[in-house]
A protein has these predicted regions:
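N-terminal leader segment of winged-helix/HTH proteins
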Residues: 1-41, 86-87, 94-97, 103
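Charged, amphipathic alpha-helical coiled-coil/dimerization segments
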Residues: 80-133
């Protein structure tokens, strides 16, 4: 039996979120796939990143803005758009993901997960050292 590097990887859901948040800047093919998934689900990339951070447990606007290096007024616009799309529900101090938002994130991360695995199956393991270090640190 001949196993490729991608066959030996095990992607947990929380690791996929970290990969999306951490690697989108360095891997062009991954960046392209994420962009396609965003467009299919009528999201911008910043909206996806904000939703993923909220899903990871960050509930305060200031924490999200600091973590993603967004200006607060930009974050407010993103949150307002997500609320209009019925993805988020904004209370006084908390931000909640709606049921339709949960389904959208599930669908998006599943699709990105499939694409990530396909990309890695095509990639020579010799070129994966940086990625391996990131995966090991998760």
């Amino acid at each position: 039996m001949n196993l490729s590097f991608a066959d030996t990887l095990y992607f947990k859901k929380e690791n996929i979120l970290e990969i999306i948040l951490g690697l989108h800047r360095s891997y062009k093919s991954l960046q392209r796939e994420i962009q396609i998934c965003c467009e299919l689900n009528n999201l911008t990339f910043n909206e996806l990143i904000v939703i993923l951070e909220i899903k990871k447990g960050i509930k305060k606007k200031i924490d999200i803005a600091n973590k993603l290096f967004l200006k607060k007024q930009n974050l407010n616009l993103i949150l307002k758009d997500l609320q209009l799309k019925n993805i988020l529900k904004l209370d006084n101090k908390s931000i909640l993901i709606t049921q339709s938002g949960e389904e959208l994130i599930q669908k998006t991360t599943d699709r990105i997960n499939e694409k990530i695995i396909k990309i890695f199956k095509k990639t020579d393991p010799k070129n994966m050292s940086g990625f391996i270090n990131i995966i090991e640190s998760l």
